[in-house]
């Protein structure tokens, strides 16, 4: 099965509890459509370069998903219907990045 990198931005007004609920809901949806969540990362509440739907910040999250193309089409369709998700990007990748991603690394400025 192919592996997909799925990054999404959730509304800034979500509490940590609501964000966890959103992530668990997306994970449950993956199981329901026959996909597997391989890895999940929360990157934090980050500023936007411009306002999106009256939000100046957003909760950035990354998921690595193993799924058939038809299942990913259904997943993307259902995520579009979720009002808490402002934007998302889904890319097909060859493998899952091992360890922490660059966004999870520490600031050494």
Curated annotation (Swiss-Prot):
Keywords: Ribonucleoprotein, Ribosomal protein, RNA-binding, rRNA-binding. GO terms for molecular function: small ribosomal subunit rRNA binding; structural constituent of ribosome. GO terms for biological process: translation. PANTHER family: MITOCHONDRIAL 28S RIBOSOMAL PROTEIN S6, SMALL RIBOSOMAL SUBUNIT PROTEIN BS6M. Gene3D superfamilies: 3.30.70.60. Pfam families: Ribosomal_S6. CDD domains: bS6. Belongs to the bacterial ribosomal protein bS6 family. This is Small ribosomal subunit protein bS6. The keyword Ribonucleoprotein applies. GO terms for cellular component: cytosolic small ribosomal subunit. InterPro entries: Ribosomal_bS6, Ribosomal_bS6_sf, Ribosomal_S6_plastid/chlpt, Transl_elong_EF1B/ribsomal_bS6. It comes from the Bacteria. Binds together with bS18 to 16S ribosomal RNA.
